[in-house]
Amino acid sequence: MDKLRIIIAGGGTGGHLFPALAIGEEIISRNPKTKIHYIGSEYGLEAKVFPIKDVWHTLLPIRGFQRGLRYNNMIRNFILPFRIIRSIYKCKKIYNDFMPNIVIGTGGYASAVPLLIATNKKNKIPIILQEQNSFPGLTTKWFAKKAKKICVAFNEKNADLIGKIIHTGNPIRTGITKGVKKSGYKN
């Protein structure tokens, strides 16, 4: 059997990043030959965490839409389309080189471009979404119709996601469940 190649995309915050890492850990523990490539944002928490975790990753120059009318927010929103275009080109190169069998999106602005590239007419790569919140975020809502399955943390009824939901709970990294109480207090 060929090696399974999976892209796990998500980040911006720990709520999207750490479930992505937990999913990757679990997949590798079940099939060590699987190749996983993480995709996140240069501006998210993953920019610090991925190098520490020593995982194969790419950071996109993407940033989320800024709400509010502050000057800095308006400048960032003006630049956003250019960041999206750069992220699309970078992401296409990753897909052409890596040729993933599946893409898992854990939400947040960092997963939108990788999911968009996966689901375009040329690629048609199957996607799975993982939603940690009781109400789906924007990225989950945008890609729900194209997803093969949507793994949810909470067993809530949601009209947008009917028929595709698998109640999995929140993915938790092994270091969290197998931690030592003493070192937890220390850190």
Residue ranges and their predicted role:
Residues 2, 37, 56, 119-186:
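Active-site-proximal region of nucleotide-activated glycan assembly enzymes
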Residues 3-13, 33-84, 168:
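Conserved nucleotide-sugar phosphate-binding/catalytic loop shared by glycosyltransferases and other
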Residues 13-14, 108-110, 134-135:
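Residue-level detector of alpha-helix initiation sites
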Residues 15, 50, 107, 150:
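Residue-level signature of catalytic and energy-coupling elements of molecular machines
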Residues 16-27:
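Short amphipathic alpha-helix
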Residues 43-47, 100-121:
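An aromatic- and histidine-rich active-site surface loop
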Residues 77-93, 184-185:
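Glycine-rich, highly charged phosphate/nucleotide-binding loops
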Residues 91-110, 126-130:
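Short N-terminal targeting/anchoring amphipathic segment
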